[in-house]
Amino acid sequence: GGCRDSKPSGNASIRSMSDAVLPSPPITYAPLSYESRLARRALTQIDMVVIHCTELPDMAMAREYGERVLYDSGTGNSGHYYLDRNGSIQQYVALERVAHHVRGHNPHTLGIELVNRGRYPHWLDSRYQQMTEPYPEAQIAALITLLQWLQQQLPSVRRIAGHQALDTTQEAASDDPARKIRRKLDPGPLFPWPRIEAAVSWSHTPR
């Protein structure tokens, strides 16, 4: 289906009663073709935000990967929100749906993906494990705005974590099967955790 601009569905019923209600950031709701096949959940189940980077060159390729069907259920892997380098935000999956973005934690988390090359295209090559692309100021500013709004909308959230802190599995290196490589390193060493920790009241799961 086509993209349309809207606030994420379901937020009206969980608005904070605080006088200082934060406006919704500008979010383009662009649901994945299989969104309706993802499991439903109550918003109160969400207790953690997980920060990822796409490890892909651009938003178009992130969309292509998100649309890939990988499971018998007719669904694939994606985050809920995607932030481009210029700070624009797209929502691929409604918060009431369980996105497949982090092993073992999907039912109770929401995933935020930042467009960043990461180790692309040598994800599991032991010679290319440095993540060298910085996160632009516009992207981080948009992330902080989104996180502060989500903090107001989802009082059940108590924690924030990087993908690499939750998925610590290793795989054989593509260039040398005798070596083991971390599957996930995102968002990586260039992600400004101190700024994020200062912007929200959630506890940060150790890196």
Task: Give, region by region, the residue ranges found by the protein language model.
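N-terminal catalytic cores of peptidoglycan-degrading enzymes
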Residues: 3, 10-102
